[in-house]
From Swiss-Prot:
SMART domains reported for this sequence: 14_3_3 (SM00101)
Gene3D superfamilies: 14-3-3 domain
A Gene Ontology cellular-component term: cytoplasm
PROSITE patterns for the chain: 1433_1 (PS00796), 1433_2 (PS00797)
PANTHER family attached to this UniProt entry: 14-3-3 PROTEIN
Protein name: 14-3-3-like protein 16R
Short name of any one Pfam family annotated for the protein: 14-3-3
Annotated stretches, region: Disordered: 238-258
InterPro entries reported for this sequence: 14-3-3, 14-3-3_CS, 14-3-3_dom_sf, 14-3-3_domain
BP-aspect Gene Ontology terms: protein localization; signal transduction
Biased amino acid composition, Basic and acidic residues: 245-258
Top-rank lineage group of the source organism: Eukaryota
């Protein structure tokens, strides 16, 4: 008979198939709670947790961007009544975003990062910590934005130190970290030069070792390398003109063999 932990993993997969991501998060939080003390999640479990939260946060991030865009248009037209309604609606989405980010950050700080024993799991969770502080920095303002940006930077830097020491330049988690760290420099810190340098260095280092890639991670690694190159192309053209194309981030997949 399946243990409660195995049952929750199965239910999380079921919820994913049904695209019921809030429930997928709940099942994976139970899996984390069931892991004894310093016991690590399996690679499959941590990927499921990541997919669950990424989908739950992703829907709200998309909503926030749409609402913010409409708000700007209405402001430029001088529709003050509409703007007031939009601001109220945007703040509702922002409170949901804050709650989701705080939920996963609490799990990471209280359990997941501390129980990580291998280089790849440490980088995975520290990258995740950076990602969710970055999502807070996307919509927070003033001192809260500054704090979120500082927390993002320290988490990504800690992850980068371990990744550079323990993971190959072609490792999908190391590449995904470089991708998201460079997006942070570009979008949050408004540092296109640093963003491009980081992305280019990660891409070049991976290219140099491409022939050492095992078959199982070849697809994952080359996909992220393509995203790094896409962003580099976009950012270098943006520095010449003010483009607004979509910036690519690392997306977790349940079948990652990291």
């Amino acid at each position: 008979m399946a243990s409660p932990r195995e049952e929750n993993v199965y239910m999380a997969k079921l919820a994913e198939q049904a695209e019921r991501y809030e429930e997928m998060v709940e099942f994976m939080e139970k899996v984390v709670a069931a892991a004894d003390g310093a016991e690590e999640l399996t690679v499959e479990e941590r990927n499921l947790l990541s997919v669950a939260y990424k989908n739950v946060i992703g829907a709200r991030r998309a909503s926030w961007r749409i609402i913010s865009s409409i708000e700007q248009k209405e402001e430029s037209r001088g529709n003050e009544d509409h703007v007031a309604s939009i601001k109220e609606y945007r703040s509702k989405i922002e409170s949901e975003l804050t709650s989701i980010c705080n939920g996963i950050l609490k799990l990471l700080d209280s359990k997941l990062i501390g129980s990580a024993a291998t280089g790849d799991s440490k980088v995975f969770y520290l990258k995740m910590k950076g990602d969710y502080h970055r999502y807070l920095a996307e919509f927070k303002t003033g001192a809260e934005r500054k704090e979120a940006a500082e927390n993002t930077l320290s988490a990504y830097k800690a992850a980068q130190d371990i990744a550079n020491a323990e993971l190959a330049p072609t490792h999908p988690i190391r590449l995904g970290l470089a991708l998201n760290f460079s997006v942070f420099y570009y979008e949050i810190l408004n540092s296109p030069d640093r963003a491009c340098n980081l992305a280019k260095q990660a891409f070049d280092e991976a290219i140099a070792e491409l022939d050492t890639l095992g078959e199982e991670s070849y697809k994952d690694s080359t996909l992220i390398m393509q995203l790094l190159r896409d962003n580099l192309t976009l950012w270098t053209s943006d520095m010449q003109d003010d483009g607004t194309d979509e910036i690519k981030e690392a997306a977790p997949k349940p079948d990652n063999n990291e």
